[in-house]
Amino acid sequence: MGERIVISQDRSFVTSIQAADPHEPVSDDLHEVHHVHELTPYGMLMASLGSCTGIVLHTYAQHHGIDLQEVSFDLHYDRIFAEDCAECEDIETYRERIDEAISLSGDLTDRDRDRLYAVSHHCPIHKILTDGMEVDSYLAEE
């Protein structure tokens, strides 16, 4: 089970999303996503991460005079099971993982690229995913 989406965002925050068919995990064929309901929950999560990170990077670049023209994210979601995981104690145990490859386009120095990469970790969605969040669910009274 694995999923892949690619997000591109220009300096005007125009965002495009492409996704691989989640039922064909070995396929690299991507299709344009026109509506969020075309994505699985994992695809929606990755789209949130990439889109949010893109906004953070473009906003930072604009405020600091960095010539960031476009940013794209190639995101892969997968589960790593105990047989592939040295830290998992039980064979039924797995860890969930998102790999995010960030590509930056523009007239950027190495220093600009390093700064933008550091800033990418300040995206609120990235923080929630890496730090965790408590969710308190209950039935509302009628």
Q: PLM ranges: what are they?
A:
Residues 49-53:
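Alpha-helical metal-binding/catalytic segments enriched in His/Glu/Asp
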Residues 1-47, 58-142:
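Extended beta-strand/beta-hairpin segments
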